[in-house]
Amino acid sequence: MAKRDYYEVLGVSRTASADELKKAYRTKAKELHPDRNADNPQAEAQFKEVNEAYDVLRDADKKAAYDRYGHAAFEGGMGGGARAGGGYGQQGDFASAFSDVFEDLFGDFMGGRGGAPRSRAQRGSDLRYNLRVTLDEAYRGVQKTINVPASVACDACKGTGAEGGAEAVTCPTCSGMGKVRAQQGFFTVERTCPTCNGMGQIVKNPCKVCHGAGRVEKERSLSVNIPAGVETGTRIRLAGEGEAGMRGGPSGDLYIFIEVREHALFQRDGVHLFCRVPVSIAAAALGGEVEVPTIDGGSSRVKIPAGSQTGKQMRLRGKGMPALRGGGAGDMLIELAVETPVNLTARQKELLREFEKLSEDNNPEGKSFFSKVKGFWDGMTG
């Protein structure tokens, strides 16, 4: 079977740039890779065809020979000047081309040429701590002491993992690269070194305290400043208070996530507070004053307008929560709840019945409601 044109295989024009060739190759190779096409028996042959085409067109000399002589340039019939370095059958050149692109596609799985070893010094992991505070503490701000279990640098070996603090030595398996290579079929696979776990170094005489880890588990007490205005979900970062680093690497950070407990009197909405205050029927009808508590521990007297109903809201400006990053404070919203009296005496019941007879014209909302009900039923029967 005649070979297809290499440009056709990659789906590019003959004037395609090196970047366009590489982009086309990456797309085709990713699409046709055998690992992703286990149920397609033709995928492997197409995959090899794509790699063969790119192996030629990525090389300036091979490309020039192909543009001039076509496939004949690599079939052995041309003179030495026409053969530009061999074709698909030369595994070294092909593996080089394959590795260049697949290093981008699969990261550490495919190794490029001249890859660097993993950094020997590793930063420690970040830690999370959930801290609950009261609404009063969130209002004022508070200093809290917390106990955090974490890995810290071993004092016996100064974090090196070696007995007596001796330095680690270069790993003999990977020669300090942290990776080892293996030939699989027509390409090279690069994996993390199993001896040093990618560190590039090993400890000959492990520390007896930390067993070569360079870290030990320990609970630490930390003092944390909780600023005024925090709310549930607020995150506080303590730099360098996370897990200890490896091989002299920096420690991670500790992130404290705040949860504000519910309050018996106040509900919170951002910087605003909400308080439901019960009032008597007499106070709601005649008007008056009610004393309401405030989050700062004090109280404020609030005037109740005559004729107030349940659900009426009044605002105390500046009596809410402080803004976390400055900018004043929110408000406190007071909602009235008109309270129905219970456990009435005979005299109280008598007075209420008399009051009801005298108040037919004093209940506009009820009058309006029953008028609407009458209209509804008239419409149903009419």
UniProtKB/Swiss-Prot annotation:
Zn(2+) 2 binds at C171, C174, C193, C196. Binds 2 Zn(2+) ions per monomer. One of its GO terms (biological process) is response to heat. Its cofactor is Zn(2+). One of its GO terms (cellular component) is cytoplasm. A zinc finger (CR-type) spans 141-219. CDD domains: DnaJ, DnaJ_C, DnaJ_zf. It is found in: Cytoplasm. CXXCXGXG motif repeats lie at residues 154-161, 171-178, 193-200, 207-214. Residues 5-70 form the J domain. It holds the Pfam family DnaJ_C. Keywords: Chaperone, Cytoplasm, DNA replication, Metal-binding, Repeat, Stress response, Zinc, Zinc-finger. Gene3D superfamilies: DnaJ domain, Heat shock protein DnaJ, cysteine-rich domain, Urease metallochaperone UreE, N-terminal domain. Zn(2+) 1 binds at C154, C157, C207, C210. The keyword Chaperone applies. One of its GO terms (molecular function) is ATP binding. Belongs to the DnaJ family. Participates actively in the response to hyperosmotic and heat shock by preventing the aggregation of stress-denatured proteins and by disaggregating proteins, also in an autonomous, DnaK-independent fashion. Unfolded proteins bind initially to DnaJ; upon interaction with the DnaJ-bound protein, DnaK hydrolyzes its bound ATP, resulting in the formation of a stable complex. GrpE releases ADP from DnaK; ATP binding to DnaK triggers the release of the substrate protein, thus completing the reaction cycle. Homodimer. The J domain is necessary and sufficient to stimulate DnaK ATPase activity. Zinc center 1 plays an important role in the autonomous, DnaK-independent chaperone activity of DnaJ. Zinc center 2 is essential for interaction with DnaK and for DnaJ activity. This is Chaperone protein DnaJ. The gene is dnaJ.
